[in-house]
Amino acid sequence: MVQTHSEVKRVEELRRLLQQASYAYYVLDAPVMEDAVYDQLYRELQQLEIQHPELVTPDSPTQRIGERPATQFLSVRHNIPLYSLENAFNVEELQAWDQRWRRQVAPTEAEYVAELKIDGSAIALTYENGILVRGATRGDGVTGEDITQNVRTIRSIPLRLSFDGIENIGKVEVRGEAFLPLEVFKQINEERQKAGEQLFANPRNAAAGTLRQLDSKIVARRRLDFFAYTLHISGMDDASIANTQWEALELLQKMGFRVNSQHQLCQSLAEVADYYRYWDTERLNLPYMTDGVVLKLNSFKLQEQLGFTQRFPRWAVALKYPAEEAPTRVENIAVNVGRTGALTPLAQMRPVQLAGTTVSRATLHNSDRIAQLDIRIGDTVIVRKAGEIIPEVVRVLKELRPVDTQPFIMPTHCPVCGQPVVRETGEAVTRCVNASCAAILKGSIEHWVSRDALDIKGVGEKLVHQLVDKELVHSVADLYSLTNEQLFVLERMGEKSAQKLIEAIAQSKNQPWSRVLYGLGIRHVGSVNAQLLSEKYRAVAELSSAKQSDIAGIYGIGAEIAQSVYQWFRISANQRLIERLQAAGLQFANTEEISAVDNANLKLVGKTFVITGTLPTLKRDEAKALIQKAGGKITESVSKKTDYLVVGEDAGSKLEKAQTLGIKQLSEAELLKILA
């Protein structure tokens, strides 16, 4: 059917009216339209779009629900990483954070924005030309899952932004928290109970689970809500938009987002402390759950100067409330054995509700902690969730102790393999040192196949336990000689599954030297340290023959890690493991750097680069990869040792510092010319 001009105009008018009504109802909580009128206009719009499908747009109110259920969520890379926040658990730790950031910059006065920390699930929204084009889960902060179909069902998230008073808007990135109001959470659990379904433990878990539903109609019925708290706009001068977090929150509201109304601008830490104490009790009267206060430096200029650590922004902190505590009874003390052989005592307790979750186990850390607590089987203890995450026993109520209890003694032999355990001088941890211990082997294989190591898909804890228990593998090297016939004896392992697993294992042979090094599980060597070591020692032969003092001299390594690495390579069993893995085809050298191309042909060897701002065509990771492939080194901060600063749009304090130090600046075009 051919559309008329009047029909096009009517569709636009209906969308405008419905969007205004939704904003007033869901965001402002101030309805401007009767439900019957809204329904009538909605049906009229729906009918016009059915008659003229070409008029349907992604921001239409009719597009919030009803799409075909997804079969899976696609992994997407965030345009701007979603960092975690550093935690503080009291005012003293807050003051320590304040002192740390002040040491990074010249003495300055600062304002703080205090916001309630909503206990939900973080999501990232992307708008292009004012239209919502993507919603994604936080994931690991770098990559998340595309949940756009589900995000559209959240009524407090605008499908089209309002840009009154703002011109030439670019791509808009908004971060916020999706959550379930307590009343809605209660209703959902009542419905699940009637249906005989498992109840959600808390609103946070329910919100996270809802966002990952494949059917958006289910998401719509769950009635998630959303508070926006972070705004990024590309393609514009930041100063023309907002100079502060406070201004950004105001702008988010103008754009059509719901912003938590309880935020406060504070001129001092004393005001922050008052805000924190006030909401410690008042938060219990809110219609949603909170688990602390997020504190941010108000000035964006100051935020840019401070930057980020590897995990946190230096300019923000999460001030958590004291963890919830409850009494319960210790029914047993078990001892777990980890991949490094560490014996960890674990209190098995009568289940108790803490912070909305059921807790039945708590770590006791080591024998020193047990002695300090004097904890015994049968004791009544106070358990809390430290940081709302890790349950721990904080004290024993000895006045309630049964008369027949006995002090707990750490085993002298490994509870898994039966071999004697040792406790090295100066260490609090007791360890099994039997390299053939099944617990150590299982842990080492689980570590080897993990995402940050060799990232072998389809190898989980249950499969690892089967492989070890059936004696199919005695080290990670045995994974590379598994056959289909061997795998057929495992539970739920058919011909296709076995072949798929063998292919995944074979594919891991292409993982780089840094991942292999991390996968070896050397004590104290995390993924970042493995990267540093692999950059310095480009092949295993170089690292294994390096002096301990040379290893310790690498920036970010230090004496403890160096000693651990040096000693690991002195053990003959580890030397044999490397030989077997090399024979299997694993990468024990940086093949891109040590190849037929020698250093003479690597144009950027010995040069240090810093990148700032948004480059015209290259993503930052792409620029880094090109520089590193040519032998250059990337660092995050500008110093006298920096050779080049690659400058894009919206460059900040790094450019100023480079100009002060006389460091040469390159545009993207100039960088590509050098690389050509």
From Swiss-Prot:
Pfam families: BRCT, DNA_ligase_aden, DNA_ligase_OB, DNA_ligase_ZBD, HHH_2, HHH_5, Nlig-Ia. One of its GO terms (biological process) is DNA repair. Its EC number is 6.5.1.2. Keywords: DNA damage, DNA repair, DNA replication, Ligase, Magnesium, Manganese, Metal-binding, NAD, Zinc. The keyword Oxidoreductase does not apply. The active site is at 117 (n6-amp-lysine intermediate). Zn(2+) binds at residues 414, 417, 432, 437. DNA ligase that catalyzes the formation of phosphodiester linkages between 5'-phosphoryl and 3'-hydroxyl groups in double-stranded DNA using NAD as a coenzyme and as the energy source for the reaction. It is essential for DNA replication and repair of damaged DNA. Belongs to the NAD-dependent DNA ligase family. LigA subfamily. GO terms for molecular function: DNA binding; DNA ligase (NAD+) activity; metal ion binding. It comes from the Bacteria. NAD(+) binds at residues 35-39, 84-85, 115, 138, 177, 296, 320. Residues 599-676 form the BRCT domain. This is DNA ligase. The keyword DNA damage applies. It catalyses: NAD(+) + (deoxyribonucleotide)n-3'-hydroxyl + 5'-phospho-(deoxyribonucleotide)m = (deoxyribonucleotide)n+m + AMP + beta-nicotinamide D-nucleotide. CDD domains: LIGANc. Its cofactor is Mg(2+); Mn(2+). It comes from Trichormus variabilis (strain ATCC 29413 / PCC 7937). InterPro entries: BRCT_dom, BRCT_dom_sf, DisA/LigA_HHH, DNA_ligase, DNA_ligase_AS, DNA_ligase_CS, DNAligase_adenylation, DNAligase_N.
